[in-house]
UniProtKB/Swiss-Prot annotation:
Site (Lowers pKa of active site Cys): 134
Main location group: cytoplasm
Provenance organism: Vibrio cholerae serotype O1 (strain ATCC 39315 / El Tor Inaba N16961)
General remark: In the reaction, the free carboxyl group of octanoic acid is attached via an amide linkage to the epsilon-amino group of a specific lysine residue of lipoyl domains of lipoate-dependent enzymes.
Protein name: Octanoyltransferase
Catalytic reaction(s) noted: octanoyl-[ACP] + L-lysyl-[protein] = N(6)-octanoyl-L-lysyl-[protein] + holo-[ACP] + H(+)
Function: Catalyzes the transfer of endogenously produced octanoic acid from octanoyl-acyl-carrier-protein onto the lipoyl domains of lipoate-dependent enzymes. Lipoyl-ACP can also act as a substrate although octanoyl-ACP is likely to be the physiological substrate.
The EC number(s) this enzyme carries: 2.3.1.181
CDD domains with a match to the protein in the record: LipB (cd16444)
One GO CC term on file: cytoplasm
Family: Belongs to the LipB family.
Binding site for substrate: 70-77, 137-139, 150-152
Amino acid sequence: MENQLLVRRLGRQDYTPVWQAMHQFTDQRDSTTRDEVWLVEHNPVFTQGQAGKAEHLLNTGDIPVVQSDRGGQVTYHGPGQLVAYFLIDLRRKKLGVRELVTHIENLVIHTLKHYQIESAARPDAPGVYVKNRKICSLGLRIRKGCSFHGLALNIQMDLAPFLRINPCGYAGMEMIQVSDLHPVSMEQVEKVLIQELVTLLDYEQVEFSTEAYNHE
């Protein structure tokens, strides 16, 4: 199972059920369980990371706030944003947490290069940036030597809700999205992202599914 990957395309989903399913998957996986990546668009929601502070929620209005157990601070998820959850056995891949973060940042940087978008990571604030404007947020959790949670890449969405928070705890952090820089569809970006992931983490066999994880 070391070099096998299952990619689940889950479509549009509320945040909490997917978060709970990640927990169930991670709790029940063992050394023979293949790694999975879940691709999803969430209905509008603010999620607070473990380091999140209430003062970074400025005016959430009618958008719900969920306290999550990922790393990092507050962010926004909504339609038109590609969320990728990485359910990876780090011990099997011989990866440390910092290495995985770097791999994920590089994954996004390489994906954006396909669309002639130059981007970079920042040592002081995880994620990916285009000229100091944030295009991708990142937050992970590790349990039993396995990762869950992942990245949120802004593709073609309403960025206004980010003005209701201090994104990732940074007041005035400007957000940007792929469609501001290059016309593209969610499906195109998903395809490139998975191709880059397979190359970066050396997966040899990839299977796709549209079924949600069912632990029963």
